[in-house]
């Protein structure tokens, strides 16, 4: 007696239905979709988080190295901080930078006051993307752009 050619298809369909039912009643499905979380998607980040602070400090340092300005800039305020888990971490930082009275030869940027004279005072809105791979001890400024 030869088996029906539809038997393997029927068995496969039964397995698919059983798997779909099992997934539908699993505890993870019962919790519903997570709001605001997409694997590999952008998430809002706490500005005070250690990783954000490290990325911010690196971004400003690189900005100052690449700038042709005789004076250094530092953060006035962080407008927005986001992060993205990849094979490491991408940080997307929107930052308002202000021109300080410190020249590039001065080391401690944190204690540098901002220029208050109108002809020397400059503020920029900058967007930075910083890529960090902690286990490889690497950090890179992927891209940045600024507007006066």
Swiss-Prot record:
GO terms for molecular function: cysteine-type endopeptidase inhibitor activity. Keywords: Disulfide bond, Protease inhibitor, Pyrrolidone carboxylic acid, Secreted, Signal, Thiol protease inhibitor. The keyword Signal applies. A motif (Secondary area of contact) lies at residues 84-88. Pfam families: Cystatin (PF00031). SMART domains: CY. This is Cystatin-C. It comes from Bos taurus (Bovine). The lineage of its organism: Eukaryota, Metazoa, Chordata, Craniata, Vertebrata. The gene is CST3.
